[in-house]
């Protein structure tokens, strides 16, 4: 099975400037993460954008939908910032991308920090996209959720079933 990974930025790919203390984007860490995880999957990686998810708008979501629609692969993982991941999942589900299994994932801590959850979440998403039926899902914290039954708990910092 071939899997397409769409990179959109988010905390997942942020870098830390030690002089100013600010977080910024340079390039995706995906290739390093896949190498470090010893992935042997057939993957096509495409950077769509590198933005903080708080900057994600309808135009950005339309770009992501278009890239998913154009993808030859039936399995797609999207790296995305956690703040608006659920909104993007909704846009993908409403776009009616029949026959595609799409899993969004991200990180609460930048991969550049040794304590990041990014590598674990990426591995989980790559596993889930291979076994879940067509649809749109969010994969965080070792769990997967249907797009319409998940929320980010801002108090605990984890994704959970939405009420």
Residue map of PLM features:
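Active-site histidine-anchored catalytic micro-motif
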Residues: 1-163
């Amino acid at each position: 099975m071939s899997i397409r990974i769409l990179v959109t930025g988010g905390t997942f790919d942020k870098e830390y400037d030690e002089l100013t203390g600010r977080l910024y984007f340079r390039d995706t860490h995906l290739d390093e993460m896949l190498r470090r995880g010893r992935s042997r999957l057939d993957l096509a990686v495409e950077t769509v954008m590198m933005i903080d998810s708080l900057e994600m708008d309808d135009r950005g979501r339309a770009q992501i939908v278009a890239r998913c629609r154009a993808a030859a692969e039936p399995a797609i993982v999207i790296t995305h910032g956690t703040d608006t991941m659920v909104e993007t999942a909704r846009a993908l589900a409403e776009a009616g991308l029949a026959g595609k299994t799409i899993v969004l994932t991200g990180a609460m801590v930048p991969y550049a920090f040794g304590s990041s959850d990014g590598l674990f979440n990426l591995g989980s998403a790559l596993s889930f996209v291979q076994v879940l039926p067509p649809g749109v899902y969010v994969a965080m914290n070792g769990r997967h959720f249907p797009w319409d039954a998940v929320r980010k708990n801002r108090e605990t910092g984890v994704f959970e079933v939405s009420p």
